[in-house]
Amino acid sequence: VLDTDTLRKDLRQVDHDDHDVDAHPDLYSAATTEETYRMLLEHAELLLIGGESVVLDATWSDAGHREAARAMAARHGAGVEELECRLDSGIARRRIADRNLLGGDASDATPDLVDRMPRHPWPEARPIDTSRTPDAVVDQIVDGLFGAGGVPTTFDTVSRA
């Protein structure tokens, strides 16, 4: 799993636990965002070349970034499954607050950001209801990818044991 929160901070040499965004004014600039997505796809491409599967965790609010990811995957004969996590704003605020209390996450999201984040159309993505337990969400994704029968037994044994 590669995520933009971690890559963004690595690019600007900001500690993952540092959430003082005012101290790093360029962290969310357009230039840093472009560089972050470029680096995300470069890392993903190296993993694909090595025969690995890759999950890219990002907002994907820009259609150009999504198209660049599709093109990169196509160059390597890799399939792309676009999933959009959807969640009631109240649950999202609570989960972000809980995550921030626990620490250990690179994300700078705050509960108040939930209502301020613009919604961007992503018609190619399959919506995923993330209000349920993590196991139920994984089941929903696996069922969507492989059908109600689930994944092949060898993978099932390894990943769900």
Say what each PLM segment does.
Residues 1-52:
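Conserved substrate/cofactor phosphate-moiety recognition/catalytic segment
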Residues 6-9, 60-62, 86-93, 132-135:
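Conserved nucleotide-binding/hydrolysis micro-motifs of P-loop NTPases
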Residues 17-21, 73, 99-103:
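Short, hinge-like loop/turn segments at secondary-structure boundaries
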Residues 50-54, 79-81:
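Loop/turn-to-beta-strand initiation segments
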Residues 60-61, 69-78:
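Conserved P-loop NTPase nucleotide-binding/switch module
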Residues 75-96, 128:
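Conserved phosphate-donor/acceptor-positioning beta-strand/loop module used by diverse small-molecule
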Residues 98-161:
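Small-molecule kinase domains that catalyze NTP-dependent phosphoryl transfer to phosphate-bearing small molecules
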